[in-house]
């Protein structure tokens, strides 16, 4: 795993953060060292997907990047009841060409081992290079968006949640993980400070933290948990709860009635 040092040197002109080839090369290390609970969120997203998958449906990984969630869901389903995932497909969608290409390589490398180790054939993963707002969604039992909505234009988020809700079958779920902010300024500052302490503990310097924060400004725009929950309920979900939180990173599950 290549170490993330993209912001280790002083940069005179810091561009907005992009998911390009440079980011792809260090992305696994970046996530591990800069997203509290990332590995747990991916693993438990797969557990949740395994619970709610319905036969002959689609599972979606929206903003799939290197396919961690899609692969985890596939592996969880391969270990479960074959009848539950019969006729299912996992669709991984990302608009970054470099991410899709790297994801395709990772899936092909991992596929043989998965096929040999499990008791029944794995659910196929289908990759799509596309914008989330433009790609059709249908016949879904599970939709996962792990740290993706925060990069969508705020004015387009409600419509996207409605599209997802409409694509889900009754009893289907959305797993939504996001960096969040808090309405109380003192609480918000506490979580930001602790998040930066977490990054320092994982080897990032103050320069790296500062420069990446500048690069993400106006690119990653977080919402509050209350805003997320209100939007999901308005979109047509019947139930919504936070199932994971560490500092200013959280994951919710929304269930369609």
Language model features by range: what are they?
Residues 158-170:
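A short glycine-rich, Lys/Arg-flanked "PGG" loop and its adjoining helix->strand segment in the class I
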Residues 235-257:
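Core SAM-dependent methyltransferase catalytic element
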Residues 12-17, 21-41:
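Class I SAM-dependent methyltransferase Rossmann-like catalytic core
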Residues 60, 65-116, 120-134:
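Class I SAM-dependent methyltransferase SAM/SAH-binding core
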Residues 37-55:
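Conserved alpha-helix/loop element of class I SAM-dependent methyltransferases that forms part
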Residues 175-201:
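Conserved class I S-adenosyl-L-methionine
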Residues 144:
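A conserved beta-strand element that flanks and buttresses the S-adenosyl-L-methionine
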Residues 218-235:
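Short alpha-helix
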């Amino acid at each position: 795993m290549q170490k993330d040092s993209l912001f280790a040197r002083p940069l005179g002109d810091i561009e907005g953060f992009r998911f390009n080839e440079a980011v792809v090369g260090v992305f696994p290390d970046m996530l591990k060292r800069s997203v509290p609970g990332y590995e747990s969120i991916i693993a438990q997203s797969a557990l949740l997907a395994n619970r709610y998958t319905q036969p002959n449906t689609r599972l979606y990984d929206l903003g799939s990047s290197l396919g961690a969630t899609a692969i985890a869901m596939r592996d969880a389903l391969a270990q479960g009841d074959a009848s539950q995932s019969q006729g299912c497909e996992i669709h991984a969608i990302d608009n970054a060409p470099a991410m899709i290409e790297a994801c395709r390589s990772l899936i092909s490398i991992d596929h043989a081992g998965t096929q040999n180790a499990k008791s029944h054939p794995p659910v196929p993963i289908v990759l799509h290079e596309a914008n989330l707002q433009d790609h059709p969604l249908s016949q879904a039992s599970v939709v996962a968006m792990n740290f993706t909505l925060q990069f969508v234009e705020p004015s387009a988020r409600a419509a996207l949640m409605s599209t997802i809700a409409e694509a889900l079958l009754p009893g289907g779920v959305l797993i939504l993980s996001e960096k969040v902010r808090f309405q109380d300024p003192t609480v918000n500052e506490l979580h930001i400070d602790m998040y930066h302490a977490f990054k320092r503990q994982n080897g990032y310097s103050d320069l790296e933290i500062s420069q990446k924060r500048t690069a993400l400004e106006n690119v990653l725009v977080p919402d509050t948990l209350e805003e997320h929950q209100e939007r999901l309920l308005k979109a047509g979900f019947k139930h919504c709860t936070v199932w994971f939180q560490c500092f200013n990173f959280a994951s919710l599950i929304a269930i369609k009635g």
